[in-house]
Amino acid sequence: MPYSQELHHLFNSKRLPSIRIRNKDDQTLRDEFAHCSVELKGGNTKDCFNYLLLDPRVTKNLSSRINQLSEVDCLMIFCGAIFYVGKGKGTRDFDHLKDAIGARTQNECSDKLQQILDIWKKRKDCGVILLRVFQNVVSEEACTREAAMIAALGVPHLTNCKRGTCYGSASKWTESRLRHYGAFLLISAMRVHLIEGERQIGSKEI
């Protein structure tokens, strides 16, 4: 199953957009939720974030290989390693790993938990990569970013059971516009990952 047309366009380009270029839709989203005067469905507290679960068997310590790869190649590997896109607050992202520990004794578990378990089974020092991005935002803003990234990657490439939900003006965007924004977010997330380096969480570190 191919990725979205918007991601394929980036994969086939010679270089990615400069970090200096502002994304208009991202700025619109930021401005819309920055000083909201009405009570939002998920609350107005800026305590949410987005997160990605990545498979280290795909990234292969990507940040240590950036001198041998183009940024476009890095994006292809990064996107190929993502198996779950989420939104939450507190320890929501870490809770998936705890759930996987509990799923060891069950006969059946979700695709997401099974992939976490498969990563841990690979070898003793292999762990899940948990990347937090776009932090300190309200719930509806985080939900919209989640939906955009899922749209760009495509549900068949993920263990997410459903597509996300957009709020505000983004709820009226075309699918193409949403996917284009999601591709921008994935580039931003990849750049964070390359700067921070790869940190894996093993089953004994839960």
List each language-model region with its residue ranges.
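Structure-specific nucleic-acid interaction/processing domains
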Residues: 4, 8-206
